[in-house]
Amino acid sequence: MGVIENIENTSFESVKKSDKSSTLMESKNSDLCPITPYLTEEKVKVTSRLNEDLSTPVEDVFDMCVSGSNQKNNLGTSAAKKKLVFSSNEYVSENECENGSLMETVYESVLEDIICKQAEDILAEILVSGSSRDVLKTPPSAARADGLVETCPGAPMKRKQVRNKRTVDMNLCRKLDFDSCV
């Protein structure tokens, strides 16, 4: 990680443009026109120490074995739970290491086969027996105790309003002068 040791602030200087637009603005109302600062000099010196120890901070290590709420509570206080070490100071003969890992692999393989065989036998018993077939089916829905129908009712219908329709004779409409209303 680089450490910034020295940063000089960038200096800005207020400079007014000497063109026609700025002189027109100044002559009208200099209080309303903003003056834009122009960059005159920029110096940034960044140095870092590359000989620092590069490591992940302890508080940022994620441990899968800790549950979510406990991990949030212990985030700052817990250290890394697992650390891989690839070099060992102890001398172990190659034959002992090979024999131990070979026996462990064989043991895990046999244990996995036994568990799979037992699971297959239990599943076969469930499928063969007639009474247990009902166990594997989805149960029928229970009758409702409140007496409501299980189907949804139809959409409500809008009530028709009965109006007294008046029939107007066409002769009467001709006699009315609609142009005078406008």
Swiss-Prot record:
Q: Which domain of life is it from?
A: Eukaryota
* InterPro entries for this protein: SMR11/SMR16
What drives induction of this protein's expression? Up-regulated in response to zinc ion contamination, but not in response to mixed metal ion contamination (cadmium, copper, lead and zinc).
**The protein's name:** Unknown protein 1
**Origin species:** Helianthus annuus
